[in-house]
């Protein structure tokens, strides 16, 4: 059996007019693979632009350049990687890288400077090595070979373009050289049958489910152990999540129960208060308001009557008091007019006798004291008369009377 072909997409089939009339060709089989139908673009060999090796032109590979210097962080990571990996064997690669990144950030500037100095020194060496590399004979030979190959490819592309402009066929199909096909005297019918069976056999192999296993799907023992640890950690995490879900569900049920209890208690209290509510009769309230207004009006009328009666009683009591005061004033006036004459005559006699008796013995101080006593008595008499006149001024005005000293009254 021939080698299994690559999975290259098939090109668009050529029209039937361009199919060659070679012996052994039985129509166009759309299921045939391209690797078993030798086709060339442009009609002659050396013009296959899909693979440069088919035309005999190969672009050489450049020589290996010097390695670039490692960055300071990569130097530090390479230095402490084994230590961190040994202290944390269960962690993943990205977790170890995260730890090393934190350690690098925690370093001081002096500690980082060591790695920076190494990087700068290697960088200088790298620049010198690159200069020597670019001037090396191998690199110069690579440049020359590359330029020649590119020129040949450009020439080939120009030739292909010219052939396409002249109308030459874009694609021609030639029979493939298959070791299964051998000419042992069979007719064209047998050859076509063999080709048909071969093509179907190849198609069945291509479309079958049995493929070469991928290298990445091969699991090693170390990988299995890592996967087992990951499975265990995932199971532990799953159990934690389930426990948290149970706790959340319990708290939710507890809150729900409290809400239901509070709702029931509120409904019961509402029913009790609704049963205790008082029905308001607006007609009864209006009747009570009217009755209260009537009582208030009656009390107001009674107070007004009492005030009017008190005013009448006060007026009736004022009239006899005025009459009594007027009578008393007239009697006093009569009594004062009668003794006025006798008192005047007696006063003159007493004053003369006193003057005669006191001319030899009296002192100026005694005279002054006597005169002050007379004046004070006169003032008292006037004040008494004024009080009497003020008490009776509402009804009768009494005529002014002469003041009488108190000594004369005593005599």
UniProtKB/Swiss-Prot annotation:
Biological processes per GO annotation: chromatin remodeling; negative regulation of DNA-templated transcription; neurogenesis; nucleosome disassembly; positive regulation of cell differentiation; positive regulation of double-strand break repair; positive regulation of myoblast differentiation; positive regulation of stem cell population maintenance
Entry-annotated residues carrying Phosphoserine: 265
Post-translational modification: Ubiquitinated by TRIP12, leading to its degradation by the proteasome. Ubiquitination is prevented upon interaction between TRIP12 and SMARCC1.
Protein location: Nucleus
PROSITE patterns: HMG_BOX_2
Cross-referenced CDD domains: HMG-box_SMARCE1
Stored PANTHER family: SMARCE1 REGULATOR OF CHROMATIN, SWI_SNF-RELATED MATRIX-ASSOCIATED ACTIN-DEPENDENT REGULATOR OF CHROMATIN SUBFAMILY E MEMBER 1
Domain notes: The HMG domain is essential for CD4 silencing and CD8 activation; mutation of this domain blocks thymus development.
Identification of the protein by name: SWI/SNF-related matrix-associated actin-dependent regulator of chromatin subfamily E member 1
Higher taxonomy: Eukaryota, Metazoa, Chordata, Craniata, Vertebrata
């Amino acid at each position: 059996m021939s080698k299994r072909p690559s999975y290259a997409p098939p090109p668009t089939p050529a029209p039937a007019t361009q199919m060659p009339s070679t012996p052994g060709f039985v129509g166009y089989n759309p299921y045939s693979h391209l690797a078993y139908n030798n086709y060339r673009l442009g009609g002659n060999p050396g013009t296959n632009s899909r693979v440069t090796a088919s035309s005999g032109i190969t672009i050489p590979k450049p020589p290996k350049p010097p390695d670039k210097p490692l960055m300071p962080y990569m130097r530090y990571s390479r230095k402490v990687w084994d230590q961190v990996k040994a202290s944390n064997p269960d962690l993943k690669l990205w977790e170890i890288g995260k730890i090393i990144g934190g350690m690098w950030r925690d370093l001081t500037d002096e500690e980082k400077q060591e790695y920076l100095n190494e990087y700068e020194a290697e960088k200088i060496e790298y620049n010198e090595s690159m200069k020597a590399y670019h001037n090396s004979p191998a690199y110069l030979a690579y440049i020359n070979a590359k330029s020649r190959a590119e020129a040949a490819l450009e020439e080939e592309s120009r030739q292909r373009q010219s052939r396409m402009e002249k109308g030459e066929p874009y694609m021609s199909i030639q029979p493939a050289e298959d070791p299964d096909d051998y000419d042992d005297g069979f007719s064209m019918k047998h050859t076509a049958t063999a080709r048909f069976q071969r093509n179907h056999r190849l198609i069945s192999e291509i479309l079958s489910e049995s493929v070469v296993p991928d290298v990445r799907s091969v699991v090693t023992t170390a990988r299995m152990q890592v996967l087992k640890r990951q499975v265990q950690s995932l199971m532990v995490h799953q159990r934690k999540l389930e426990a948290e879900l149970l706790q959340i569900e319990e708290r939710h049920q507890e809150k729900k129960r409290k809400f239901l209890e509070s709702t029931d208690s509120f409904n019961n209290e509402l029913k009790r208060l609704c049963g205790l509510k008082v029905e308001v009769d607006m007609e009864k309230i209006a009747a009570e308001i009217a009755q209260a207004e009537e009582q208030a009006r009656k009390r107001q009328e009674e107070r007004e009557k009492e005030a009017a009666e008190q005013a009448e009683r006060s007026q009736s009591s004022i009239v006899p008091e005025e009459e009594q005061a007027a009578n008393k004033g007239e009697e006093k006036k009569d009594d004062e007019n009668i003794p006025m004459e006798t008192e005047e005559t007696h006063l003159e006699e007493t004053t003369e006798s006193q003057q005669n008796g006191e001319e030899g013995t009296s002192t100026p101080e005694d005279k002054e004291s006597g005169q002050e006593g007379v004046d004070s008595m006169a003032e008292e008499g006037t004040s008494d008369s004024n009080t009497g006149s003020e008490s009776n001024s509402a009804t009768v005005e009494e005529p002014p009377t002469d003041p009488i000293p108190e000594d004369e009254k005593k005599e």
